[in-house]
Amino acid sequence: ARLSDPGYAAPAGEEYRPDLRHVGKDREKVDAQMLVQGERAFVEDRLPQDVCWLKVLGSPIAHGWIKAIDTSEAEAMPGVVAVVSHLNTPRTLYTSAGQGFPEPSPYDQALFPRKLRYVGDRVAAVLAESPGIAEMAIKKIKVEYQPLEPVLSIAQAKTEGAPVIHSGAVSYASGEVPEGISVKGDGRDDGIIYQFSLHADPHRNLAASASGGIGDIAKGLAEADLVLERSYRANRVQCTPLEPHVVLARIDAGRLVLHASTQVPWHVRRIVARVVGISENKIRVIKERVGGGFGAKQDLVVEDLAGYLAWTTRKPV
């Protein structure tokens, strides 16, 4: 079919509500011309000539400790701006899921963990003048790992004596510590901060819990003609938009500016401010056009590390 064919386009629906200007009226998509003409709209359209490129070294193991890191060869390479790991970055705890405030999600991560919890977890990162240099420098980083038994299912995580994923100390920003919860932890591991109780017990791999009932449940079950007990499991869903997570972080007149493909610019500003250690009014988040999100871009994946490196190196990242 061709655009010139009379039957190509569906006829517009009848307009309604003559008393209103927009509701019930045929209106042109506000950004249609910009997109079809190829105008700058996305994060990658904003990259300056002197932009630096960030490459992350991911964990090859699902669970374990980082015993030693040697970044000297990577640091000595021409074109490398910075090499970072848990050895030279703040231990500030935060959450990458910022919905709501105070956030119900626990503050359970730092820029780089000392204890690795999944394949791909951040071990180190290189900031370099080109993607190729960053890629080569990553391969120069030497890491000694101490593998631990991984937890591969919810059923395994619930068993007595299962490997503990978050073994650090637990603290609460407000409220009392729930009865029976262990708050002391392994000093080698970063801790967890809860803004308020979620009836969690991290040292038993319990992220949060909720229970309740109406009336005398035991009596009701005893008197019931039929008791049906079932367990239901929903698999994890991960959205895959055409545009992956991407950000450009730069300094402008003393402020940190983030051009982000995000659904939550205000959360990005608040969380990055905590990570970098500056006030929110020192950060400007420009929400560029998002090439698909579907909820996946309500979390921070790259904004925290890129923002930190842009602020500390004063380079566009």
Model-derived features: positions:
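Flexible, low-hydrophobicity surface segments
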Residues: 1-190, 227, 312
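Phosphate/pyrophosphate-binding loops at sites that engage ATP/ADP/AMP, CoA/4′-phosphopantetheine
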Residues: 73-75, 269-285
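Beta-strand segments within the central parallel beta-sheet cores of soluble alpha/beta enzyme folds
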Residues: 86, 282-288, 315-317
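A glycine- and small-aliphatic-rich helix-loop capping segment at beta-alpha/alpha-beta transitions
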Residues: 101-102, 263-265, 273-277, 299-309
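Helix-loop-helix module between adjacent transmembrane segments
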Residues: 191, 205, 212-215, 254-256, ...
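Conserved beta-alpha junction segments in alpha/beta enzyme cores
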Residues: 210-276
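Thiamine diphosphate
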Residues: 270, 288-314
